[in-house]
């Protein structure tokens, strides 16, 4: 009887580990960004958005006001080896998984209708001193 209980417990744990709503996105190093650098010109205006080759699978950054920025990792939340891509129609404001088609709002990190996972994108904190954007 103990053998059956142990096997059943192990099977249940293994099944729970395969669920698609497991949120486990690691975060990566993000170096500060000088928004006056021409490379980051998209971030100089409110509403500007840019995907930086930083973080774990890239970081989408959007300037939401003069002093505020939102930053999310482009790794798919339930499978961090997959990098989300900008939507062909919506650009950097919507990120799409090339494998399953799941879509995420890059302004708040939320999954959109039809996403395989209910997990949100990994959110980075930001600070801005007027010249340098720090993402952590």
Where do the language-model regions lie?
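Bacterial N-terminal signal peptides that target proteins for export
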Residues: 1-7
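Short cysteine/histidine-rich metal-coordination sites, predominantly Zn2+-binding motifs
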Residues: 90-99, 111-123
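C-terminal motif of bacterial Sec signal peptides marking the signal peptidase cleavage site
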Residues: 14-17
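Gram-negative bacterial Sec-dependent N-terminal signal peptides
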Residues: 8-12
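Short metal-binding segments enriched for Cys and/or His
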Residues: 104-112
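N-terminal pre-ligand scaffold of iron-sulfur
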Residues: 19-91, 105-106, 122-136
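Short loop/turn microsegments at loop-to-beta-strand junctions
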Residues: 67, 99-100
